[in-house]
Amino acid sequence: SKINNRRSNNSISKRRNMKQKLEEYFDRLWPINRSLTGNGVRKSLEILSEIVEFNITEVPSGTVCFDWTVPPEWNIVEGWVKDSSGKTIIDFKEHNLHILGYSEPVKGKFTYDELQPHLYTLPEQPELIPYLTSYYKRRWGFCMSHIEFEKLDKAETYEVFIDSTLDDNGSMTIAEATIKGTTDETILLSTYICHPSMANNELSGPLVASFIYNQLKTIPNLRYTYKFIFVPETIGSIYYLSKNGENLKENLTAGFVITCIGDPGVFTYKKSRRGDALPDRAAEIILSQTESNFNIIDFFPSGSDERQFCSPGFNLPVGSLIRTMYGKYPEYHTSADNKDFISFEAME
């Protein structure tokens, strides 16, 4: 009885420890401005490399992967809008969603009518800041709550400043980690690292993947070889497939894209395009044994990086593990996808 109690206490203490570590890493990663490329991704991977032994690759901007091209590297120092009295109306330093991702630099004075086409809001969620990007079309812009937008004075002239760079000689950063098994049969865990301060839609995936890596590292004589990739969504997995796709076709037994895994909703598993591959069967069995309530949905071609892995040229056995599906919760791609929305118990 004493031994059982000790085991139970150890288990509680380990869980508390895991939850605490998840939260500590979350707090460090949260303020960093990540995008498809740039120093925010490097800084985030540097922090996560305390948990995961990464092999990091810098892919030069302009690299062609299939019919896609790696974009210029984007970095930003500051961005703001002030009125004629010098009062700051929008400030990137207050919330990094305030900037349209990949905004080109700008400095100048604009009337309300000139500025208005560069402002983005969510009239149906008026208190929230939207998350928007323009990776492949040069433009600049700011995102703000519709409430603040409605307060703008139409007779004002506004001073606008964005200190950003788009570097054709820059690079895109991707990270890979491998835990070698006794066979070359491979299980892939893929997550993306490319969004600014959003909790569920950005940080839940890399955090959960990092701690899965950490747990697997402690298990001796694993049969499968585990590959973990942390890549900018879409372009990162397309680049990865351009380099490793043939090898994956040969050795990949199962793969999972981990995304939106931090909210308190029930598990959702999105099947691979094959529909009856090993990960599809395994997910169904495990969820039915461990969860009283869950969703299993068929593959559809939009979504996250499963669309690249399951694309016709590869058709790999890769499904997606999610809690509440992207686009199905109102906080998605807004400033409400924050620490209050997620649950560290759910991530554990």
Language-model segments: residues:
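N-terminal hydrophobic/helix-forming segments and targeting peptides
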Residues: 14-348
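Short, Lys/Arg-enriched N-terminal segments with co-localized hydrophobic residues
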Residues: 2-17
